[in-house]
A protein has these predicted regions:
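Membrane-embedded helix-loop-helix hairpins and adjacent transmembrane boundary segments
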Residues: 1-470
Length: 470
């Protein structure tokens, strides 16, 4: 990289910090801090939703899959986008009108305090761990670009992303996400993809050089595709970071439209990334560590100035996910744990302060964990599996059935989480079967306990009566 590339990178970070300061001036209430006053239009929401789920693993991982197996690698990112779209089409009509802030708040309204607390803990741990992985990713990127020690890079990258998140909350993230979405789109679609195709001789070069298996959409195998759909599609449908973005929309129509656009964009983005990986195999067939496919290809094919934009695009993808998941974890803990159980009588001004302090503490914790574990990222697979296996079914049944009891939901969440953990322990942390086991146990438990627990059905609340009408 040349001085111009470093300058572009530096300007990018300065803009992010400046936006954080502006966001602090805008976020005066907890509602503004957590859901940006529920005032976003379709295009801003689309940019925010896209930016929050397309992180380092989506970008680096998809190009790696393209290098290793070809077009079949699109299932990784597309399964995430599909989950966001399905959430919009299946759930939004039934919940948008109730002004929720968290996924566990919905569990609480449907099934009571115990289920709300379990949901908050599981979802908060999951979102925090996602944030940790993104901090490690931004550290790795900065380390490679500036030749820093990884520890130094993690500290600097973590400080920048968490600085603007702590100050402005969702108002800051809205502005930074739209800005970062634009950088991502330009960097990948306008620069990296065409440059990679040009270096590889276009699509004809790919067809003439790569084996036919690289153009088979099911080459990874139906079992692996099913694993992605169960883990990432269901996980996205019950992810607090995704729900919180949807809650910023002005109305349900806007939210659903943005959700459909995300599904389309995820397909295009995943396609672009795997094609870049395929081009890298043609141009650089000897890459030993396939996690370096994207960065190696960028250094090989992108000219000065444009290279800075491309790496800023990668940084944008990573940092937008890190900030969004941090705020999601903070919202769950500050609202559904601290406020509900320890600070029950605080006014909104004090609650906003509690929210910022919680975000700060979690930011420090995320950086410490990132510095500590670095290579022990299998914890993410465990968190994703527990989230999808234990929370999805109670929410689905709670929204569409009148017969589920609080005891049934609580028992189903605990038993399914236990089942998933035992399954992962026996079959391995990368196995997809434990999620299936968890879902099956969840369904059996919630139906069986509800049947024998009829006498403990709660009186239908105004919230549940509203679901019946939606």
């Amino acid at each position: 990289m040349e001085i111009l590339d470093y300058l572009i990178f530096a300007i990018y970070f300065i803009v992010l910090i400046s936006i954080g300061v502006m966001g602090m001036m805008r976020a005066k209430t907890s509602e503004q801090y957590m859901v940006a006053d529920r005032n976003l239009g379709v295009w801003m929401l689309f940019g925010c939703l896209t930016a929050v789920f397309l992180g380092g693993s989506s970008t680096i991982g998809s190009s790696q899959l393209g290098y290793e197996i070809g077009l079949s690698g699109i299932w990784f990112v597309f399964s995430m986008g599909l989950g966001i779209t399905l959430f919009a089409l299946v759930f939004l009509d039934r919940i948008m009108g109730f002004k929720l802030l968290t996924i566990s708040e919905l569990l609480g309204r449907l099934f009571g305090t115990k289920s709300k607390l379990v949901g908050a803990v599981v979802a908060a741990i999951y979102t925090l761990l996602i944030s940790v992985t993104q901090i490690i990713a931004i550290g790795a990127l900065l380390s490679g670009v500036f030749d820093w020690e990884l520890t130094t890079a993690i500290l600097i990258g973590g400080f920048i992303v968490f600085f603007y998140t702590i100050l402005g909350g969702m108002w800051t993230l809205t502005i930074t996400d739209v800005f970062q979405f634009a950088i991502m789109t330009i960097g990948i679609f306008a620069i990296m993809l065409p440059q990679s195709l040009g270096a590889a001789g276009g699509f004809e070069g790919l067809k003439s050089t790569l084996p036919s298996s690289y153009f088979n959409l099911t080459e990874m195998g139906f079992r692996e595709i099913l694993s992605y759909l169960l883990t990432y599609t269901l996980g996205m449908m019950v992810g607090q970071d995704i729900w919180q973005r949807y809650f910023t929309a002005k109305n349900t129509k806007i939210a659903k439209s943005a959700g459909v656009l995300v599904g389309i964009y995820s397909l295009l983005y995943s396609l672009a990334m795997v094609i870049i990986g395929m081009c890298a195999l043609v141009v650089l067939p000897g890459i030993q560590n396939t996690q370096d496919v994207f960065t190696t290809m960028a250094f090989e094919t992108i000219s000065t100035g444009l290279l800075g934009v491309v790496f800023a695009a990668v940084a944008a993808a990573i940092m937008s996910t890190a900030s969004g998941t941090l705020l999601a974890s903070s919202t769950l803990i500050s609202k559904d744990i601290l406020k509900d159980h320890f600070f029950t009588k605080v006014n909104d001004t004090k609650f906003l302060l509690i929210s910022r302090i919680t975000t700060f503490v979690l930011a420090v914790l995320a950086i410490v964990i990132a510095l500590w574990i670095q290579e022990l990222l299998v914890a993410i697979d465990v968190a994703y599996a527990i989230l999808a296996g234990s929370i999805f079914i109670p929410i689905l049944f709670g929204l569409f059935s009148k017969k589920i009891t609080p005891n049934a939901a609580f028992s189903a969440m605990l038993l399914s989480a236990f089942t998933v953990i035992i399954g992962l322990w026996i079959e391995g942390l990368g196995a997809s079967n434990p999620i299936i086991y968890g879902i099956v146990v969840n369904i059996i438990t919630i139906i069986t306990v509800s049947y024998f627990d009829k006498g403990n059905r709660r009186k239908r609340s105004d919230f549940e009566a509203g679901l019946d009408k939606s």
